[in-house]
């Protein structure tokens, strides 16, 4: 053993101290914490597995297991901090019921819809799966199959899935669970700016003078970003925080202005603020004249319900929900003039004084304002409108695309931006904001993918809620679910989700790491690798793309979703899935598999195994014989480079704590559309919203319209659902972490104390919470973190033993097709 002078001095000092205490100890003894090298811990970096904030963590592995994580002090996102979920990341992969082998429903040794799950090999699993997909394709064509993916897919998993479905199987029936959380945000961006994702970044937190939360409980849902708001607010006395919600929550603890409004009335409040700005001559005319246009949107657009629903039948413009017509400023001003403070107060239940204080924050040209929102705005039957209306306020005042002035749509999932949106795994999208309905976009994708003209269908596929309806109705018969738990997370699950999974006509495949509610409803369960058991990439809410290496192996026969997707493609010959006229355009495809055409096309497979880091394993690269993650990423990056979505070269991301796109000439972009920050803004323009042909953003005239369902005599309460800080989504990971489970083991019904007293209820009482669709049994909570107003109850949805989505309504925004989980009518009765 070699002892350095430093070690010798340290040991001598310890021995001297021990001798002084009368204790005889060896000179080399020490009570100082040993080094990572002594413990044989290997540390690496990875983005957190949970929310869209995109925190970076340091991950320690030992003997093939993740044994510790801590916040990455080098990360500009979280600066060494973690929320409570992040602290326990090392445990999410090690639940006792982790799935380790494929499971197929069988009876008497063969597949049976009503059989019991039995272990099978991957070959048997893919063989029966391919048989069912081929049968459906033959009988019903591409529209008979479907896939439901995730904002938790890695970038290359989502890209491989989209390519397999849209180009391989020629079906646009692929959608991510981000349809439930971010579709309205996408719709808002595209309508107002013509390009998706925020123009600002997290640096805005250190520059803003006021923060306005529109339906976002950041203290629990984006706690690391909330620390930056709290630090700004507590460090600078002039800074103000306004929090708007349909109920009080932990974010109200920091609020200078707390606003509790009636569900759906945020539409009226936003229009009042615009009116206040105009009436008080606070319009930034130089900005508005140079950089905006005005349009009026189609109204009376329905609620995205089934066509036979009375509300849908009554809607006059359901088929043209996203349409709009140009107007001038005077027409717009006249439109919002109807939203007086008196009217807004009457609709919202918010005092006139509070509404005026809120409007003044935006109207004052000397106050830099950051607006922030998530599910309270997006999970809304007029969610796209609400996104548009918030942008209206920032555009009227010119408070946009500069440090501290930022309308910021926060993201829920770790890669809802990077995978669902940027990759384009929605049923209507292609990468880099391209869409399947645009022939030029399809042709561009086909060129990059080296496929013949006409490979990608032009018809928009089924979105998430429509997929469930089509499964129930027998229109989709072969269905693959990855990285989501929709039988727990979807709306109106008893009537519209579960029936499709158990429909005898259908074959349902679920890829997951744990036996979730959705997995248990499947016919075939495929065990998936998690997080750092594979090499991955996520894109967060500020356009930051982050990579990680594979650090450990998945248990048993579990395999990554990427491996599953690509390996499954080997089971299909081109002749089995493509029509003859398409093959005639590419005769060399004859006899080849979809794997050969999609993933061994000379581009995806161009990077050899030698380029994989020698310090890390890569099971997928080993399996396919080339660096598949790099190949998929570089092919995908072709879509965005030169089109405002530029990504850096693959290898650079492993060296960085992420980069914010567009990355041009090696430099990331902090503020988009602003000259000097965004390389796509032409010199001399100052501001240029280049997603629109004329470089101008749109200010929309959009009215208040009532919700699809409101309380009545029989069902007197509003129901709002959501999350809590301890649990991620449906709890399939976090409820398997003992510390997180103990912190919040069971969902409860938060209720105003006076409502409880009126119903003869006390805290802890068991109750039946019921809508016209279904019910759950839960317990009343009249204290604690969430404080609903009278007439509203709040129930989190993480608890698989209390499936609150049996109660919710499957109404959606008619433009974005996103579900409204925030408002339906219920009653609460003692059991």
Curated annotation (Swiss-Prot):
Where on this chain does Mo-bis(molybdopterin guanine dinucleotide) bind?
85, 152, 177, 181, 214-221, 245-249, 264-266, 375, 379, 485, 511-512, 534, 561, 721-730, 805, 822
Q: What is this protein called?
A: Periplasmic nitrate reductase
Gene3D superfamilies cross-referenced by the UniProt entry: 2.40.40.20, 3.30.200.210, 3.40.50.740, Dimethylsulfoxide Reductase, domain 2
What is the cofactor note? Binds 1 [4Fe-4S] cluster. Binds 1 molybdenum-bis(molybdopterin guanine dinucleotide) (Mo-bis-MGD) cofactor per subunit.
Q: Does the keyword Glycoprotein apply?
A: no
**Which residue range or ranges hold the 4Fe-4S Mo/W bis-MGD-type domain?**
41-97
Which reaction is recorded as catalysed by this protein? 2 Fe(II)-[cytochrome] + nitrate + 2 H(+) = 2 Fe(III)-[cytochrome] + nitrite + H2O
Signal peptide positions on this chain: 1-29
Q: Which family does it belong to?
A: Belongs to the prokaryotic molybdopterin-containing oxidoreductase family. NasA/NapA/NarB subfamily.
Cofactor(s) listed in the protein's UniProt record: [4Fe-4S] cluster; Mo-bis(molybdopterin guanine dinucleotide)
What function does this protein fulfil? Catalytic subunit of the periplasmic nitrate reductase complex NapAB. Receives electrons from NapB and catalyzes the reduction of nitrate to nitrite.
Which organism is this protein's natural source?
A: Saccharophagus degradans (strain 2-40 / ATCC 43961 / DSM 17024)
**Which residues does the record give as [4Fe-4S] cluster binding sites?**
48, 51, 55, 83
Which positions does UniProt annotate for substrate binding? 797
């Amino acid at each position: 053993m070699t002892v350095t002078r430093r070690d010798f001095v340290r040991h001598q000092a310890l021995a001297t101290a021990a001798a002084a205490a009368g204790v005889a100890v060896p000179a080399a003894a020490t009570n100082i914490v040993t080094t990572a090298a002594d413990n044989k811990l290997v540390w690496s970096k990875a983005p957190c597995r949970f929310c869209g904030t995109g925190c970076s963590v340091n991950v320690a592995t030992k003997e093939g297991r993740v044994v510790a994580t801590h916040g990455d002090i080098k990360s500009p996102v979280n600066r060494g901090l973690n929320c409570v979920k992040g602290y326990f990341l090392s445990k999410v992969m090690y639940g006792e019921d982790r799935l380790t082998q494929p499971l197929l429903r069988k009876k008497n040794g063969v597949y049976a819809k009503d059989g019991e799950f039995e272990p099978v090999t991957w070959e048997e699993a893919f063989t029966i799966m391919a048989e069912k997909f081929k049968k459906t394709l033959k009988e019903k064509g591409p529209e008979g199959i479907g896939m439901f993916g995730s904002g938790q897919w890695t970038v290359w998993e989502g890209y491989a899935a989209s390519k397999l479905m849209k180009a391989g199987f020629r079906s646009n029936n692929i959608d991510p669970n981000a349809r439930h959380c971010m579709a309205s945000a996408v719709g808002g961006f595209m309508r107002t700016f013509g390009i998706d994702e925020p123009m600002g970044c997290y640096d805005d937190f250190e520059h803003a003078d006021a923060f306005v939360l529109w339906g976002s409980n950041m203290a629990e849902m984006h706690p690391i970003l909330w620390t930056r708001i709290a630090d700004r607010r507590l460090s600078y006395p002039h800074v103000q925080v306004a929090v708007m919600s349909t109920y009080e929550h932990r974010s109200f603890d920091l609020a200078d202005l707390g606003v509790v409004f009636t569900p759906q009335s945020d539409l009226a409040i936003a229009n009042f603020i615009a009116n206040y700005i105009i009436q008080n001559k606070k319009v930034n005319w130089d900005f508005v004249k140079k950089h905006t246009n005005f349009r009026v949107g189609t109204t009376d657009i329905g609620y995205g319900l089934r066509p036979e629903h009375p509300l849908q039948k009554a809607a006059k413009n359901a088929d043209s929900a996203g349409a709009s017509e140009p107007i001038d400023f005077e027409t717009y001003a006249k439109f919002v003039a109807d939203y007086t403070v008196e009217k807004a107060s009457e609709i919202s239940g918010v005092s006139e004084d509070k509404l005026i204080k809120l409007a003044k924050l935006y109207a004052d040209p000397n106050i830099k304002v950051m607006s922030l929102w998530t599910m309270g705005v997006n999970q809304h039957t007029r969610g796209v409108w609400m996104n548009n209306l918030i942008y209206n306020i920032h555009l009227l005042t010119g408070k946009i695309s500069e440090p501290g002035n930022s309308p910021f749509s926060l993201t829920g999932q770790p890669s809802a931006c990077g995978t669902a949106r940027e990759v384009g795994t929605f049923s209507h999208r292609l990468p880099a904001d391209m869409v399947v309905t645009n022939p030029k976009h399809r042709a561009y994708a086909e060129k990059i993918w080296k496929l013949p003209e006409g490979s990608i269908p032009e018809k928009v596929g089924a979105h998430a809620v429509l997929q469930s309806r089509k499964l129930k109705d027998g229109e989709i018969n072969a269905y693959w679910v990855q990285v989501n738990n929709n039988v727990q997370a979807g709306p109106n699950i008893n009537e519209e989700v579960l029936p499709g999974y158990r429909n005898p006509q259908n074959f349902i495949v679920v890829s997951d790491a744990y036996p979730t509610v959705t997995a248990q409803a499947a016919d075939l369960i495929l065990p998936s690798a998690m997080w750092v058991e594979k090499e991955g990439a996520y894109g967060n809410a500020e356009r930051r793309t982050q990579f990680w290496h594979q650090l450990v192996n998945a248990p048993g026969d579990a395999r990554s979703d990427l491996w599953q997707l690509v390996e499954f493609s080997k089971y299909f010959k081109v002749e089995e899935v493509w029509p003859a006229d398409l093959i005639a355009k590419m005769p060399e495809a004859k006899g080849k598999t979809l794997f050969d055409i999609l993933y061994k096309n000379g581009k995806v497979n161009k990077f050899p195994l030698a380029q994989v880091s020698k310090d890390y394993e890569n099971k997928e690269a080993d399996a396919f014989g080339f660096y598949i993650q790099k190949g998929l990423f570089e092919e995908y990056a072709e879509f965005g480079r030169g089109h405002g979505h530029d990504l850096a070269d693959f290898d650079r991301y492993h060296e960085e704590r992420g980069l914010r796109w567009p990355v041009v000439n090696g430099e990331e972009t902090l503020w988009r559309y602003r000259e000097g920050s965004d390389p796509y803004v032409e010199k001399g323009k100052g501001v240029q919203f280049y997603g629109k042909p004329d470089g101008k953003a749109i200010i929309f005239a959009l009215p208040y319209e009532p919700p699809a369902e409101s309380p009545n005599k029989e069902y007197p309460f509003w129901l709002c659902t959501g999350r809590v800080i301890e649990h991620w989504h449906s709890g399939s990971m976090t409820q398997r972490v003992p510390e997180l489970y103990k912190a919040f083991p069971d969902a409860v019904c938060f209720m105003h104390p006076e409502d409880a007293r009126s119903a003869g209820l006390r805290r802890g009482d068991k109750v039946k919470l019921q809508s016209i669709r279904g019910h759950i049994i839960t317990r009343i909570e009249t204290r604690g973190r969430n404080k609903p107003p009278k007439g509203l109850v709040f129930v989190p949805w993480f608890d698989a033993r209390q499936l609150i989505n049996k109660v919710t309504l499957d109404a959606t925004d008619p433009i974005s097709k996103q579900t409204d989980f925030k408002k339906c009518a219920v009653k609460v009765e003692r059991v």
